[in-house]
Amino acid sequence: MLVNTIRQKVSEVISKVYDSEIEFEIEIPPKKEFGDLSTNAAMKLAKTLKKNPREIAQEIVKSLDEDPSFDRIEIMGPGFINFFLSNELLRGVVKTVLERKDEYGRENTGNGVKIQFEYGSANPTGPFTVGHGRQIIIGDVLSEVFKELGYDVTREMYINDAGKQIKLLAQSLWARYNQLLGVEKEIPEGGYRGEYLVDIARDLVSEIGDKYKDLWNEEVEELFKQTALNRILSSMKDTLEKIGSSFDVYFSEKSLIEDGTVEEVLKLLKDRDVVYEKDGAVWLKVSAFIDEEDKVLVRSDGTYTYFMTDIAYHYKKYKRGFRKVYDIWGSDHHGHIPRMKAAMKALDIPDDFFNVILHQFVTLKRDDEIVRMSTRAGEFVTLDELLDEVGRDAVRYFFAMVDPNTHMVFDIDLAKAKSMDNPVYYVQYAHARIYNLFSNAEKKGVKFEEGKHLELLGNEEERVLMRNLGMFNTVLKEVAQMFAPNRLTNYLQSLAESFHAFYTKHVIVDPENPELSNARLNLALATGIVLRKGLKLIGVSAPERM
């Protein structure tokens, strides 16, 4: 809100005086003596016009000098313009928040453009790991923020239910089934050793007895494959419910083969002369588009590679009418991006259609010791176990608060702490404090009138809090532009910090001064609205009591 206001005013001056349009930054300066907000507009324009940036800054300041939105405007250094906002402008933020309530921060930047976020996608060969958990929360927050900015968002999970890993899963379950019946069977090389398969095998023994003891054929393979898939997918959906996540679409890889999409795409690629046969396999001419080796699409035994089905999947996304798709992948899949871009180009799909957001790995820390994890070895902490230990709110907030590009160390002890050192507790406590103020006001006989006496707000702590409230929609845009949910958690920490400072330094509910109390309660209410909205976008509760 505040950034939009200043951007519009500065842009109008630049257009009127210099007949130019430029992109420039507006941000909170590092020190309070530099004002409430600062811009580099003069320096950006100076590069374009080949003029002295301070002279341009002086012209901008001169044009805005009488504007009631500013107490004063100063030029610093080579041409930074520092704005000291008027109380009138800041009070307008509180008024707007109170008027719009949960709609505050919502914009129509996206104009209903149809986009898709695909995330959480995993081989259904075992429970979700904590790494999957991080990806799910990144996807959830980005989906919510893009919806808030006016995009038509579809959340989708891709189920890798075709391919060699599913056969390995069936063989692993069959081995566990036989072991329970007293038959010595080894888990196949590269198979799955987790205890979850023992539980499924135990249920199978109860249901069918020893019917398939030491018996393996296509029928048995299909039975064990479907049993494992159904049980694990059901368990994964239970975990999603526990973490508070849901998807609009669960898309089966197998369906792409069954409905002919893979063959359709393969024919398209052949018609475009971007595939060839070698050693009995079908290859994509990746090297015709990027500096990388060609890749196999169909193996010599006639089975499709994961690359082939993935190309078909994204072709189908395009045909479903998405303007852009965003896949969220672990950083170990970065090598798959260029070849997928090449495949999209081969299908004549626009360059900006397919986008990938990478995230780094997660390490768990408990009692200052690192907990190590591995899916196939069966020795890993599941997302369910983490949720059971620290709770949904902490899991969601902690996964959101680290830049996706940064390796994350999840401190279990900190996540469980009921103290102000715990970031999620710190923000939630600010929200609970606000609601306690209204209970306190009622007990003390202070009548609350929404939107009244805002003209009494204006001390330093109130100004900082009002300014921070006015940055909310700017932060949402930053989250979307940078694909960085941590921008939102950083903002909520800052907003909570400014509220705690306001709460600690000033008497908010004072029966001897009802009008000032009312003004401060309005500021507190506006803060509560934004805290609650921000937490909701992350999928975290906003308790009224703690």
From Swiss-Prot:
Enzyme Commission identifier(s): 6.1.1.19
HAMAP family with a match to the protein in the record: Arg_tRNA_synth
Record note on quaternary structure: Monomer.
Family assignment from sequence similarity: Belongs to the class-I aminoacyl-tRNA synthetase family.
Source organism of this protein record: Thermotoga petrophila (strain ATCC BAA-488 / DSM 13995 / JCM 10881 / RKU-1)
A GO CC term assigned to this protein in UniProt: cytoplasm
Protein location: Cytoplasm
NCBIfam families recorded: argS (TIGR00456)
Major localization class: cytoplasm
PANTHER family: ARGININE--TRNA LIGASE, CYTOPLASMIC, ARGINYL-TRNA SYNTHETASE
Protein name: Arginine--tRNA ligase
InterPro entries, per database record: aa-tRNA-synth_I_CS (IPR001412), Arg-tRNA-ligase (IPR001278), Arg-tRNA-synth_N (IPR005148), Arg-tRNA-synth_N_sf (IPR036695), ArgRS_core (IPR035684), DALR_anticod-bd (IPR008909), Rossmann-like_a/b/a_fold (IPR014729), tRNAsynth_Ia_anticodon-bd (IPR009080)
Enzyme class: ligase
Swiss-Prot/TrEMBL keywords: Aminoacyl-tRNA synthetase, ATP-binding, Cytoplasm, Ligase, Nucleotide-binding, Protein biosynthesis
Superkingdom classification of source: Bacteria
Listed GO MF terms: arginine-tRNA ligase activity; ATP binding
Catalyzed reaction equations: tRNA(Arg) + L-arginine + ATP = L-arginyl-tRNA(Arg) + AMP + diphosphate
